[in-house]
Amino acid sequence: MSEILEASHVYLDNPAKTVDEALEFISQKAVELGFASDAQAVLDALKARENEGTTGMMEGFAIPHAKLDNFSKVAVMVVKFAGDVEWETMDKKPIKVAIAICTPQEEKGTTHLQLLSEVAIMLTKESFRSDLLTCDDPEKLAAIVEGCFK
C-alpha cells in the first residue's frame, strides 16, 4: 500500500483553531490534490463521520476519515497545526496533528479499515507520536507515516 502519502500531502503550520476549520482545509486540499472533485461533499462526509463519534484520539492526534464515491483514489494527508486545535478527544487535550484518510466508497470494508487500523496502532507508540510532533520536513513526515502502511 505504497504511494498513498507523498510530501505534497503534508501541510505544516496550518492556522486552523477548530475542528471545522481543519476539516474545511482537508476538504479543499482533497480537491486541489485531485483526490476528489467536490470539496463540499468531502466536508459533508468528514463532518458526518465526526458526528458519529469523534476522530480525535489522544496525545494531540486525530484521524479524520471519510468514505465517498467522490474520491478517485485512496489518499492520506498529514496536517500539523501551528497551535492547538479544539477537537473532542479521548483525553480532552487539543489536537496538534491530523492524519486524514480518504477512501473511495467501494473500499470501505477493506482498504479504509486497514489504513485506520494501521494508523491507530502506530499512534499507540510513543516514538511514532514523538517523531510526528518533532519533525518539520514534509519528505520525512511522509516517510514516517507511510512506514505504518504494510
Where would I find each of the regions flagged by the language model?
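Cytosolic covalent-transfer regions centered on His/Cys nucleophiles
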Residues: 1-150
